């Protein structure tokens, strides 16, 4: 029996568009909506977390980890292999409204649109979230990786209350706890982190290849406080109380700096 292809995404001259969210295509969509600038790349997963099927991944060109290969009975076979490793989740966000956590696998949403614009390099996603019988939100997420200054990335969250009144909490920062799926664990050990309500930074190193990644984020748009956790997460928490028609936004600019070789390690502090 012959195979028949179905067209899930809309294709435009400069855009790929997803109209409506189908969980069956979640991981495929994450691949299609990936961003990269040859220095770093990030899959198109949901910033706010998602309890359905997902493969979160953010990668740095040339940043790898090593592992042993099961010994072969034949000569000349590899005993050690290197692989590009999942690094920091620099779009890490957790959103709560009136005590309800945003999770597209569980929440009632409508008017979902996600698109990537190849002319501008911008990935955007928007939808309406019905929090409860009285409260409804419109949310827009945007992100990009810089082509001019490859160490820089950006993300923006915009919200508008369509009805009701909302007490909104946004936890945003840098998450170095994400596992490398093939290994089933995070391949980094945290070296240091700091948070102050407006910025956060974290540094971590791979266990075997001894490669280091420094990530820092600066935020603006909402009042923030440091969010303390014992995990390898550097994040702040932002709060806004909004009535119907009111808007709020939170922007972040992220810097990612690698130490992958002898020269980069020697100049790491200066960079």
How would you label these PLM feature ranges?
Residues 2-271:
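Beta-sandwich/jelly-roll carbohydrate-recognition scaffolds of carbohydrate-active enzymes
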């Amino acid at each position: 029996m012959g195979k028949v292809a179905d067209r899930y995404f809309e294709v435009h001259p400069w855009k790929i568009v997803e109209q409506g969210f189908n969980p069956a295509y979640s991981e495929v969509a994450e691949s299609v909506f990936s961003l990269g600038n040859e220095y770093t790349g990030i899959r198109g997963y949901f910033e706010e977390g998602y309890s359905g099927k997902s493969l979160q991944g953010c990668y740095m060109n040339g940043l790898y980890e090593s592992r042993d290969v099961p010994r072969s009975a034949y000569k000349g076979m590899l005993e050690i292999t290197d692989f590009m490793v999942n690094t920091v989740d620099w779009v890490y966000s957790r959103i709560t409204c009136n005590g309800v956590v945003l999770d597209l696998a569980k929440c009632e949403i409508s008017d979902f649109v996600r698109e990537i614009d190849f002319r501008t390099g911008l990935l955007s996603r928007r939808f309406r979230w019905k929090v409860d019988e009285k409260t409804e939100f419109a949310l827009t997420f945007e992100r990009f990786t810089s082509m001019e200054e490859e160490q820089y990335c950006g993300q923006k969250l915009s919200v508008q209350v369509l009805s009701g009144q909302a007490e909104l909490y946004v936890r945003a920062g840098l998450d170095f706890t994400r596992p490398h799926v093939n290994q089933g664990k995070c391949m980094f050990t945290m070296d240091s982190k700091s948070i102050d309500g407006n910025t956060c930074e974290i540094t971590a190193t791979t266990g075997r290849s001894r490669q280091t990644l420094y990530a820092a984020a600066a935020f603006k748009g909402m009042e923030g406080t440091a969010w303390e956790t014992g995990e390898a997460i550097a994040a702040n928490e932002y709060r806004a109380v909004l009535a119907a028609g009111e808007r709020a936004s939170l922007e972040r600019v992220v810097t990612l700096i690698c130490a992958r070789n002898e020269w980069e390690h020697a100049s790491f502090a200066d960079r």
